[in-house]
């Protein structure tokens, strides 16, 4: 392929060369971005099929080829220093794949194909524009020719059309119609007038009133053409009515289209046009397209040269694309030939240097250097295991368990200082089949099972992401030998580290490079690798990483407490049972003693709930029988519960334990008091609440307009109101004169005598001191006789009888002689639980209010601004307060101040009257 000539302008040449280099390095996405940004820049017309497009494509191909060669050259150099591999001498050499980041041949071909398509689309758009411009120019020339033939004054016609456009009166339309009929002397005259109307209506800047009023003029002319039999003018209007009507109809909205459509109905009714024209007018888009095609055929002599020029450009682009593809194929073939020529001497030398394969030894080597091979169908290469020197016991002490007799099989290849379960591949049963349970998993090793059950399949890459770290080589010997290991003890006693780089089963260690084997009861493929949940980060709105409750319950056996949970799947199950074929691990001095009830279900979980997720961040790694059941109090000194990120990065739900139920006013929280939740299983109530939250709305659980449950927080607000009342009651009872005043007086508040006393009628019984005296008298009346109690109550409550408007008293019972639910001692200072005075959901009024949109969580009213408790039946109010509405505060400070001032004023007036 010959190199096209570069542009003479050095600046433009530099732009093309630099862009070719950038596109070769960054890929076709960079070219797309450049085309979008520089689509209006004339300097970048070469990207859209303009001049020097061929030079740009050739330059781009050369840059890509040079980049591939530069990246392949360093790969060929170290190949000579590699150790010889036992390959067949005549095996064909595979082509060297392109370096990472360099586009392959298929990518280059696809990029060229995409460029070709973009160029074709751009050229087609340019062709359409040029064809339209050529047709418009031809039409204008035709109009000029008719104007020269007829010698009509179009300025006079425009002067008559302007009043029609402005006012559209009958006189203006009549004047325009008369001028047209008076000048319709020949077909050229008629064509000139009709063409002038078409140009005025189809112009780009024409507004709707101009088009509509001129169409009204055409309608009037058509009517008179039919009456006067003016066939020449009618034929001229038939040629231009399609673009006039279709353009006006498609350029306006629907309400304005109806005005134009009425004219079409009138034309169809009167029969001004034939059926073909009526069909085009009924489908404006189709009719306009047919009209444009007619113009192209009519002016084909002007259109064909434009179309041929663009067709040649498109064909040139296709030819360049084909040549580019052919050039790439040839270059690839040449590279393969050169590669074969370079590798032939090397392969011959390898064949000569390769010794004959030795006979298979009778016994395997004690420490093989080559990693164990996997099954032939494994798609991944086996993971390189550490050498045997890394697993020697410290101090030269050998594992006494390894000296025992071993059975035949793969265990014979294991050195005596390595546990047999460490890197021994286990046979994997096909999917859908379980391994036979006759053989115990560890028949020849005296130690317990590993902390992580070995999995051996093609999914070991999930656990092999961090094995390149040097930290893997620092593992100690297996903890089930007789040598205590302090580092292993930290795996059970040290809390999990919050950093995601460290696995959750070690204080600072990483997972040993076990051969991972899929669980025997797992029936499906493994999900992608997932990290453990980050509880020190804001949570996702919905955790879809966990399976729903009781998912595949019968397919997973329970696990032993010392086993690591199947971390990639985020499954967790009751951690009490251990499979029957695998006993509990042998005791080791570095381990905790197993609980006596290790084979029993823990008290907080059973086999019915295998949906417990992984323990939260901060779990200290203890087995479940060493943990308490639902710790009622959080140990704030526990370092595993202290978050190590700023408080604003934590989930908002961690603030909930710091807000007490009785708190109702703003109280700033101390970020140092925030603690992570302790490990505890979800309760039945929590699981039921989660299921109810995601359940669809029903009649019992309606939703509001925003999609939330209507009464979802009713119980919470109800409990919060109870706690708030209880706190207020305790504050009132904790005073020096009322320490025992309200303890048992509620039960007797309704059974007092109804006697009155005239002595207290003139006293100010509504003050706060009067309320205190009543409380004091009632508290003392419990330890006296009934008559004295009655006398004390009658003296202190002569006007209020048995009621008080103090905040602690909420509602009077209907019964005349209620009794307290429980009788504590006379010296008891604990207040009895205050019964809830709010109406329950069984109340008809409550149900009616809920149906009308009341949420039920606050006060009455649309904005919940009213009272929250039912109206008290017998509240005694002052004379000026008795007619106030429901929900009006009676302890308004301004009203109280005005009332106190009025007392002094009335007293002065009475004193003045008495002096007179």
UniProtKB/Swiss-Prot annotation:
It is found in: Cytoplasm; Cytoplasm, Perinuclear region; Endoplasmic reticulum. The modification Phosphothreonine is found at residue 819. Expressed in brain, placenta, lung, liver, kidney, pancreas, cardiac and skeletal muscle, and in cultured HEL and Dami cells. Keywords: Acetylation, Cytoplasm, Endoplasmic reticulum, Isopeptide bond, Phosphoprotein, Ubl conjugation. GO terms for molecular function: RNA binding; transmembrane transporter binding. Involved in calcium homeostasis, growth and proliferation. It comes from Homo sapiens. This is Calcium homeostasis endoplasmic reticulum protein. The lineage of its organism: Eukaryota, Metazoa, Chordata, Craniata, Vertebrata. The keyword Zinc-finger does not apply. Residues 750-766 have a biased composition (Low complexity). Transmembrane segments: none annotated.
């Amino acid at each position: 392929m010959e190199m096209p000539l570069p542009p003479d302008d050095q600046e433009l040449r530099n732009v093309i060369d630099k862009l070719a280099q950038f596109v070769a390095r960054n890929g076709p996405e960079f070219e797309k971005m450049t085309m979008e940004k520089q689509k209006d820049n004339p300097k970048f017309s070469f990207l859209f099929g303009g001049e020097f497009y061929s030079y740009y494509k050739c330059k781009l191909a050369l840059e890509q080829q040079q980049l591939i060669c530069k990246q392949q050259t360093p790969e060929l150099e170290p190949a000579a220093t590699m150790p010889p591999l036992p390959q067949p001498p005549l095996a064909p050499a595979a082509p060297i794949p392109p370096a990472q980041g360099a586009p392959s041949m298929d990518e280059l071909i696809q990029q060229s194909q995409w460029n070709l398509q973009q160029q074709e689309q751009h050229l087609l758009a340019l062709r359409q524009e040029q064809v339209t411009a050529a047709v418009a120019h031809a039409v204008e020339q035709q109009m000029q020719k008719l104007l020269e033939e007829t010698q009509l004054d179009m300025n006079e016609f425009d002067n008559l059309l302007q009043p029609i456009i402005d006012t559209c009166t009958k006189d203006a339309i009549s004047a325009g119609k008369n001028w047209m009929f008076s000048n319709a002397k020949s077909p050229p005259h008629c064509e000139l007038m009709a063409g002038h109307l078409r140009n005025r209506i189809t112009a780009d800047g024409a507004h709707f009133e101009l088009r509509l009023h001129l169409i009204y003029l055409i309608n009037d002319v058509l009517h008179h053409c039919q009456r006067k039999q003016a066939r020449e003018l009618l034929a001229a209007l038939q040629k231009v009515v399609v673009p006039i009507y279709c353009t006006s109809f498609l350029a306006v909205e629907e309400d304005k289209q109806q005005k134009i459509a009425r004219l079409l109905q009138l034309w169809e009714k009167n029969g001004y046009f034939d059926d073909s024209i009526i069909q085009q007018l009924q489908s404006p888009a189709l009719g306009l397209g047919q009209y444009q095609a007619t113009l192209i055929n009519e002016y084909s002599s002007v259109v064909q040269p434009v179309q041929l020029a663009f067709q040649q450009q498109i064909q040139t682009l296709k030819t360049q694309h084909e040549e580019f593809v052919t050039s790439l194929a040839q270059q690839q073939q040449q590279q393969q030939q050169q590669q074969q020529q370079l590798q032939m001497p090397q392969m011959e030398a390898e064949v000569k240097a390769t010794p004959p394969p030795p006979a298979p030894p009778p016994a395997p080597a004690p420490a093989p250097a080559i990693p164990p091979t996997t099954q032939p169908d494994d798609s991944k290469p086996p993971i390189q295991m550490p050498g045997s020197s890394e697993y020697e016991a410290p101090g030269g002490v050998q594992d006494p368990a390894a000296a025992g007799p071993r059975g035949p099989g793969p265990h014979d290849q294991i050195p005596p200082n390595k546990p047999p379960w460490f890197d021994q591949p286990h046979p994997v049963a096909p999917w859908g089949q379980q391994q036979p349970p006759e053989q115990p998993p560890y028949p020849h090793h005296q130690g317990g099972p590993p902390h992580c059950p070995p999995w051996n399949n093609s999914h070991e890459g999930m656990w092999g992401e961090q094995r390149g770290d040097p930290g893997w080589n620092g593992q100690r010997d297996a903890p089930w030998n007789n040598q205590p290991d302090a580092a292993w003890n930290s795996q059970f006693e040290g809390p999990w580290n919050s950093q995601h780089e460290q696995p959750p089963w070690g204080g600072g260690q990483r997972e040993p490079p076990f051969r991972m084997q899929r669980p025997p009861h797992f029936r499906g493929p493994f999900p992608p690798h997932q990290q453990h949940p980050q509880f020190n980060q804001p949570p996702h709105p919905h955790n879809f990483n966990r399976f729903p409750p009781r998912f595949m319950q019968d397919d997973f056996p329970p696990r032993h407490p010392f086993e690591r949970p199947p971390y990639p799947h985020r499954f967790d199950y009751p951690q009490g049972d251990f499979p029957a074929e695998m006993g509990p691990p042998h005791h080791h001095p570095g381990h905790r003693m197993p609980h006596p009830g290790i084979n029993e279900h823990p008290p907080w979980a059973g086999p019915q709930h295998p949906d417990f997720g992984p323990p939260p961040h901060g779990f200290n790694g203890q087995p479940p029988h060493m943990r308490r059941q639902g710790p009622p109090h959080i140990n704030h000194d526990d370092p595993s519960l202290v978050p190590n990120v700023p408080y604003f990065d934590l989930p908002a739900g961690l603030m909930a334990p710091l807000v007490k139920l009785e708190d109702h006013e703003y109280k700033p929280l101390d970020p140092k008091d925030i603690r992570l939740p302790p490990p505890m299983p979800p309760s039945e109530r929590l699981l039921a609440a989660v299921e109810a939250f995601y359940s669809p709305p029903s009649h019992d659980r309606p939703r509001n307009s925003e999609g939330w449950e209507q009464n979802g927080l009713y119980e919470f607000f109800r409990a919060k109101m109870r706690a708030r009342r209880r706190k207020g009651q305790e504050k009132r009872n904790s005073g020096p004169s009322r320490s025992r005043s309200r303890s048992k007086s509620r039960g007797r508040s309704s059974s007092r005598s109804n006697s009155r006393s005239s002595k207290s009628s003139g006293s100010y019984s509504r003050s706060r001191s009067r309320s205190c005296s009543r409380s004091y008298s009632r508290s003392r009346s419990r330890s006296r006789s009934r008559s004295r109690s009655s006398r004390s109550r009658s003296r202190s409550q002569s006007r209020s009888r048995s009621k008080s408007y103090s905040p602690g008293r909420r509602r009077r019972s209907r019964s005349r002689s209620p009794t307290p639910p429980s009788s504590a001692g006379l010296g008891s200072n604990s207040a009895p639980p205050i019964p809830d005075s709010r109406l329950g959901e069984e109340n008809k009024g409550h149900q009616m209010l809920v149906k009308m949109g009341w949420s039920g969580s606050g006060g009455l009213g649309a904005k919940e601004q009213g009272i929250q408790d039912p109206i008290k039946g017998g509240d005694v109010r002052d004379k000026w307060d008795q007619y106030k509405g429901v929900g009006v505060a009676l302890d308004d400070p301004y009203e109280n101040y005005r009332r106190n001032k009025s007392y002094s004023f009335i007293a002065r007036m009475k004193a003045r009257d008495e002096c007179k």
